[in-house]
Structures are given as C-alpha cells and as structure tokens.
Amino acid sequence: MRKNRAPKRTVLPDPVFNNTLVTRIINVIMEDGKKGLAQRILYGAFDLIEQRTKEKPLTVFERAVGNVMPRLELRVRRIAGSNYQVPTEVPQDRKIALALRWIAMFARKRHEKTMLEKIANEIIDASNNTGAAIKKKDDTHKMAEANKAFAHMRW
C-alpha cells in the first residue's frame, strides 16, 4: 500500500491565453501524447467561436465550463449487502475536471466534419445552456434528486 497520497501536480498556463483552464482542456482533448495537435484544434476552435459569437473566446469557454459543472453526483455505497446510490457534493477541482471531460466527450460524439468544429460548437452550446454536456449535468442532478432519500448515508 502507498504511504500517502500523491501530491497534486500544478498545471502550467497555456502559451497563448496564459490560462490553466485552457491547458487542462488541451490535456483532455489530447490523444496519444499529441499535445501540439490538441493545441491546434483548440486554438482553431477558439478562432471559430470568436467568428460566430463576436465575443472573446476565453469568456465563452469559461461560461461554458461554469454551466456544465455539476453540483451533485452519485456515489455507490454498499450497506448491509445492498448498493445505494448516495448523492454527494462534488469538490471544486472534480467539478472542473468533469465539466472539461464531458465537453470533450460530447464534442467527439457530434456529427460535424472536423474536431475543430465539434469542439467549437459544443463550447458555444454549453455557454448557451444547451447541448449534450448540459443534458448530462441535468441528468446527473435529476438522479441525485431521485436518490435524495439516501443522502443521510453519506460518509
């Protein structure tokens, strides 16, 4: 067993926007260690966002992440041989991680031609409180609400 928990690694801000949140989404988009490609995709998507919304892409992106962040999630807890889905509050760093993961995941599932367009459209949709990532957050909250009776089993 481990002696203690591995320390959280600090994320360096990205070179263009000087923002750690942008670096984190780049790391989520990245596949097979191709960070340069992930950066090209995201910065291209940001250019597209700027063209379509006439707003700063960073503000649109931050609004999108804020809209997708879940407040509650379900954790499975085994008590007396049965599994209960217990709603628990989500810590701030996990909220951000889930939001970024959901945005990237649902962007990949979209039907636009390029990944650049998929990411741009998913971010725009999320900033307008629509899209699949927002639906995922709402479904998570609905499930938590439905299992509210087990909230006293938190640990």
UniProtKB/Swiss-Prot annotation:
Give a GO biological-process term: translation
Key word Aminoacyl-tRNA synthetase present in the record?
A: no
Stretches that traverse the bilayer: none
Q: Which domain of life is it from?
A: Bacteria
Which molecular function GO terms apply here?
A: rRNA binding; structural constituent of ribosome; tRNA binding
Keywords from UniProt, A to Z, are: Ribonucleoprotein, Ribosomal protein, RNA-binding, rRNA-binding, tRNA-binding
Is the keyword rRNA-binding assigned to this protein?
yes
| InterPro entries hit by this protein | Ribosomal_uS7, Ribosomal_uS7_bac/org-type, Ribosomal_uS7_CS, Ribosomal_uS7_dom, Ribosomal_uS7_dom_sf
Question: Could you name the Gene Ontology cellular component terms for this entry?
Answer: small ribosomal subunit
* Quaternary assembly: Part of the 30S ribosomal subunit. Contacts proteins S9 and S11.
Query: What role does it play?
Result: One of the primary rRNA binding proteins, it binds directly to 16S rRNA where it nucleates assembly of the head domain of the 30S subunit. Is located at the subunit interface close to the decoding center, probably blocks exit of the E-site tRNA.
Q: Which PANTHER family match?
A: RIBOSOMAL PROTEIN S7
Query: What family name appears in the similarity comment?
Result: Belongs to the universal ribosomal protein uS7 family.
What protein does this entry describe? Small ribosomal subunit protein uS7
Q: Which organism is it from?
A: Mycoplasma pneumoniae (strain ATCC 29342 / M129 / Subtype 1) (Mycoplasmoides pneumoniae)
Gene name of the encoded protein: rpsG
